[in-house]
Amino acid sequence: MTSHALPLGTGARERALVQPAIDGLFLATILFVTFAKVHWQLAADLSLADVLTALFLVVFLWDRLERADARLTRTSVVALGFFAAFLLVYLVGFFNLDTEQALTQWTKGMIKFVLHFGFLVAGVTLLARRAERFYWYALAAFCGGIALNALYGVVQLILAELAGANLDAALIEPITSRETGIQVYGVVGGTEEVFRPNALTGDPNHLGIELVIPLLVLTPLYLRLERGHRLRTPLAVLLVFLLVVELATLSRSALLGLACGTFVLALPYRRHLRRPAFLVPFGAVVLLVGTVVAARWDFFLTVLRVRTNTSAAAASPHFGVYGFVPDVLSSNPLFGLGLNNFAVYYEFVTGRPDFGPHSFYVALLVESGIVGAALFAGFVIWLFRRLGAARRIGRALTVARDPLAARVRPLAWGFTAALVATLVANLFYLTMTFYYFYVFAALAVALPVVFGRRPRYG
């Protein structure tokens, strides 16, 4: 094993968990953040990750109070400023609520917001105080949780296809008392059901968009690993697996985002796309998918035609949702209809209690108006600026011939590509209100804090 193995950290003998209770809850929250089906209806719809977050925040704040330690990094202060600004927007939006249902939705949304953005602030603060190795553990927990979700989805799909069985009925429903299962997209030939795995996310599009993150974050890291590195083969296998599951979700939004994110990565890593390290795993995906498709050609051809239908009738619902914006802005232009009330308005307009075609950006404008949308744009710009700082650190490390450059720069590019992909995928879907995006944001903005604090230059 080379001396540059992941994690490439500050001291080989440092304790993995400095404060086991705080660090363990932090990593557990990240690991389970995409397990949306594991949730319970209490004061709000709380997932397992929400419960772990509440425990983490209580222990974290108690520790800080006990130590009389109020120190924050500059990044944490900025994150706290965004928290206060969003909170102010949502509190002003409270006065636009006009029904009991709207108030209930606002309350649920506020509980989620405080937990999730609170985790972002506390998470960045914690990562800034831990060794580089701990950051790698956090990244592994995040990507590992999504990978476990994908594995669950594969088992879910196999059982549905071969035995008509519902994996959720055996594993999830006894815990949550909620009836869930794989999505049945339709029927081909009157007899063959088309299944789309949703794993533990609750929706195949959610699974597909979340899978984009480890695919884009880990690919540049994998491509820069030294020959013979102990993680090179496991990462290649993992990326092949994740891409196959991505395709199985049949999510057009996810594939659109993945294509845009791949374009971002192709700019700095285009030379790697002609090398065996990329071509062999990609060829394995093509061979595996091609074999499965060839075995059921007529079935998959029918599904592909439906999923790539660009007729006006098929496309209009996805673009039609943007028609909500002028109507809402004409009545509540500055602060919208109130936090978490897009679902209420959607049902009012369409008559559908379950979401049809929708968009994060439409929901953003409907719920928080022009002010909220402008604030979120500022938040995204800040994320890009922090990732830009991480890339500059990577370049400086390269100039200084520091081996850590082979980790930091690819990671910064991977996060940048994943952020672009997520933004694009949410044009016609809605996942950026979910908890996983706050965890992603925490890892992204902490990147230059964690790897830019030690003197390495010159």
Give each language-model segment a name.
Residues 1-23, 396-409, 426, 430, ...:
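A juxtamembrane structural motif centered on a specific transmembrane helix
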Residues 20-40, 53-122, 291-292, 422:
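N-terminal hydrophobic segments of proteins, predominantly signal-anchor/transmembrane helices
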Residues 25-31, 233-242, 388-428, 444:
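Loop-to-helix entry and N-terminal half of a specific, functionally important transmembrane alpha helix
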Residues 27, 32, 54-60, 259-262, ...:
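Transmembrane alpha-helices of multi-pass inner-membrane enzymes
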Residues 118-122, 136-269, 381, 385-392, ...:
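Alpha-helical transmembrane segments of multi-pass inner-membrane proteins
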Residues 151, 157-163, 247-249, 266-310, ...:
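A membrane-periplasm/extracellular boundary helix in multi-pass inner-membrane enzymes
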Residues 195, 299-368, 389-395:
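Long extracytoplasmic/lumenal interhelical loops at the membrane interface
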Residues 199, 203-205, 243, 323-326, ...:
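A conserved mid-to-late transmembrane alpha helix and its immediate loop/hinge
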